Regions:
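Catalytic histidine-centered segment of alpha/beta-hydrolase-like enzymes
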Residues: 146-159
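Conserved alpha/beta-hydrolase catalytic His-Asp/Glu region
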Residues: 38-39, 55-108
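Alpha/beta-hydrolase-fold serine-hydrolase catalytic core, especially in secreted/extracellular enzymes
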Residues: 171-180
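Structural beta-sheet core signal
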Residues: 2, 28, 114-118
């Protein structure tokens, strides 16, 4: 099973489209399907760099201003990211991520075993329709009342159990917050 969230989904999609390895299931958090023009990506890079670095400088104090939460369980990861981030690395990542271009094609059989989760309250929900058009055989659960990556951060055990259910039974479990 391939699991991808946020910008890391670019790597997972490259893996799915460029490898000969068999993948039975994939799960994507829909936030990574934002499509932003090249000029806009160039403009936002220095601001994003400053925002991420500020997480290190403020010991996580700016997290709530940048992201939807300031959960103590994720602060150490963002602080470390802010400490280790270089402008060059971010520029390279942004230059080949979030591109405003067609999604790569995937075989129908693989699409049937891919889950593209979108939280209902995140800005990236607006990209759901484009993903549905690109992959018409995929599965598109909506996590009602959730933001980008919020379920996996607040309930990692429940998230892991959900992924195990998908791998074992080829379907989403019945969860009270899932809208189809």
């Amino acid at each position: 099973m391939v699991i991808a969230s946020s910008i890391g989904a670019d790597l997972a999609m490259a893996f799915l489209t460029q490898t000969k390895l068999s993948v039975e299931h994939a799960f994507f958090d829909g936030g990574q399907f934002a499509q932003i023009g090249k000029g806009t990506r160039r403009i936002i890079t220095p601001f994003l760099y400053f925002a991420i670095r500020s997480l290190y400088w403020s010991k996580g104090g700016t997290l709530k201003k940048i992201l939807w939460c300031d959960d103590d369980s994720i602060k150490p990861y963002f602080i470390a990211a802010g400490k280790n981030l270089t402008y060059t690395d971010l520029r390279r990542q942004i230059s080949d991520s979030l591109e405003d271009k067609p999604f790569p094609s995937l075989p129908e059989e693989l699409q049937r075993n891919i889950y593209f989760e979108f939280g209902s309250i995140k800005d990236h929900f607006k990209y759901r329709q484009a993903v549905m058009e690109a992959y018409p055989y995929g599965n598109y659960p909506v996590f009602e009342g959730y933001d980008h990556m919020q379920y996996q951060i607040h309930n990692p055990k429940g998230f892991a159990e959900m992924l195990a259910h998908i791998a074992e039974r080829d379907c989403m479990p019945e969860l009270p917050f899932i809208r189809k």
